[in-house]
Amino acid sequence: MSHEKVKELQVSALENGTVIDHITFGSVLFVIKILNLENVEDPIYFGANLKSVKYGKKGLIKVSNRYFRPDEINKIALVSPSATLIEIKDFEIVKKSRVEIPDDVKDIVKCFNPKCITNVEDVPTRFHVIDKVNLKLKCHYCEKITSKNIMEFR
């Protein structure tokens, strides 16, 4: 009996759904959380600290039977601007696109200013992205700047 080493473990291909690839190193679990994927019934496969020629290390999430809305794609872009979305139907790639940080972010991020109208009244948040490289958002109402390290999602 020969003892062959397993060189690669395969995860089932998606019949239908979305692959989020090239997730920023260390962000996979956060992406799962902000997309509320821990509460879906269909299978989800994810990998963290995967080797990447382009990025060194990356993360990957495969979500069965799910395609993301624009507001969800914006959340992914804010957390992982290098991410790629791959939509699968009948085991075939039907669409592949990179996420992009939008110019305006609506009702996704909380304003950290406790006196902002969005924290006092039932007003949806709205931010203007003033720096896409370092990710800085300016509140439309109180004009406070929110940076990536203090950003909270709604």
Describe the residue ranges of each PLM region:
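Interaction interfaces in information-processing and related assembly proteins
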Residues: 2-97
